[in-house]
Every structure is written in structure tokens, then in C-alpha cells.
């Protein structure tokens, strides 16, 4: 039995984003074409004597989607003592989906590591409780999103060519960002 798993969590890039309306729950109705890109966070999950997360980034544990995903698994299965080593390469608060990608890959990894026998639909049901972007990372490639971003259709034609992503390290607090 394998007692550790190494995963790569890809970033995503919105090639298009159309905001159509705002729902009563403060989510927006959108149409978007999203592409997974070759920028990855690296995650190693290993059986341990307790649950712990180590990372090279300053992430508030209350906001950490890996921690929230673990809480959902704990409610269903009880203790699954696991050590998570996360190397962040996707910039925080950049809109590139790093946290959502990490959560999706953590759930996939835990499923395999602990033989939880969750199918893709089970994983997506858990993902829905974590955030609208999480389930996008169960269907890599190019996807069309609609609704709150939770209605996902794969696009079979993948754009050819390259992309260069520029990122300014200036972080906007979530409270300020949400105000706009």
C-alpha cells in the first residue's frame, strides 16, 4: 500500500469572462472559457499521526481550502491523519484558481491514499461545498463555464500556441476585492 502521493495542481486562466447578473446569494451568473495552464503548485500528501499542512506561503488556515476539504472528509470518515506539504508556485489571490485546484487534487489524493472509493461524482459533490472553481479541476483542458461557474462543459478544440502570463505581486485584500 502506498503511504504517500505527489500531485501537481494546475492553474487556470479565464480566456473569456462575461458577467451576466448577480444572484441573491451574491454569486454572479457568468459565461467563461477556462483553460488549464502549465503553472503548478506541488503537493505531497502522506499518512501521518495527525492532520497537518506545511506550505511556503502565508495562508490563513480558516481560508485554506485544503483544510476545509479535510474537514468535510473528517465529517464523513473520521480521522484520516495526513501530512500535506504544499509548495505554492501559483500566486495567491491572482484569480488563477490555485486554492481550488489544490482542494480538488487533495480530495483526489486522499481518495487514493486512504482507499475511500469516492467516484468522480462523489468528489464533485464535496467540491461543490468548497467553491465554484473546485470541480473545474476534475475535467482538465478547456472548459466552458456557466451559471455560477458550476455548470461545466468540456470543449474538444484546444487552442494551439503559447501564453505568457504576467503577474504583479501586488495583493488586493479579499474584503476590498469583493467590494468591487
PLM feature spans:
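Membrane-embedded alpha-helical segments that form the functional core of polytopic membrane enzymes
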Residues: 84-92
Amino acid at each position: 500500500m502506498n503511504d504517500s502521493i505527489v500531485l501537481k495542481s494546475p492553474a487556470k486562466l479565464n480566456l473569456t469572462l462575461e458577467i451576466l447578473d448577480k444572484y441573491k446569494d451574491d454569486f454572479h451568473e457568468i459565461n467563461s472559457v477556462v483553460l488549464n495552464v502549465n503553472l503548478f503548485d506541488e503537493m505531497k500528501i502522506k499518512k501521518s499521526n495527525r492532520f497537518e499542512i506545511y506550505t511556503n506561503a502565508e495562508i490563513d488556515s480558516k481560508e485554506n481550502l485544503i483544510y476545509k476539504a479535510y474537514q468535510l472528509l473528517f465529517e464523513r470518515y473520521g480521522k484520516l491523519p495526513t501530512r500535506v506539504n504544499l509548495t505554492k508556485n501559483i500566486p495567491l489571490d491572482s484569480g488563477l484558481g490555485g486554492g481550488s485546484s489544490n482542494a480538488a487534487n487533495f480530495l483526489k489524493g486522499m481518495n487514493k491514499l486512504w482507499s475511500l472509493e469516492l467516484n468522480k461524482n462523489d468528489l464533485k459533490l464535496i467540491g461543490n461545498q468548497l467553491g465554484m472553481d473546485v470541480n473545474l479541476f476534475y475535467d482538465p483542458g478547456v472548459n466552458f463555464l456557466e451559471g455560477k461557474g458550476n455548470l461545466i462543459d468540456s470543449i474538444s478544440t484546444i487552442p494551439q500556441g503559447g501564453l505568457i502570463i504576467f503577474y504583479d505581486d501586488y495583493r488586493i485584500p479579499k474584503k476590498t476585492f469583493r467590494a468591487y
